[in-house]
């Protein structure tokens, strides 16, 4: 169960263009030289963590060791079915969400990391830049 599942976004160096959370949900917009990727979580998310990529070096190193560094570097958006972040949310809520199949989603760019815990798949829209 503890595996990384990528979403096969077009290859490229992405940056975080926008992160928005409001009544309508959570939107992540990633941009590369060739593409714009919009990731929409239209419902409730159980946790959201946005950080500078360099601020989580220990965890990033653990992921590279566990999932293979080369694969990690090729994935801009992925999910982990079992993670320390999911366990943290479970502990902090005294197991309130344990009956749900929570997933740990990660948008990982060269500069930023956005992590979301949700029980459903997001909608992903990929547009070629003009």
Q: What is the predicted function of each stretch?
A:
Residues 1-130:
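Surface-exposed, interaction-prone regions used to assemble/regulate multi-protein complexes
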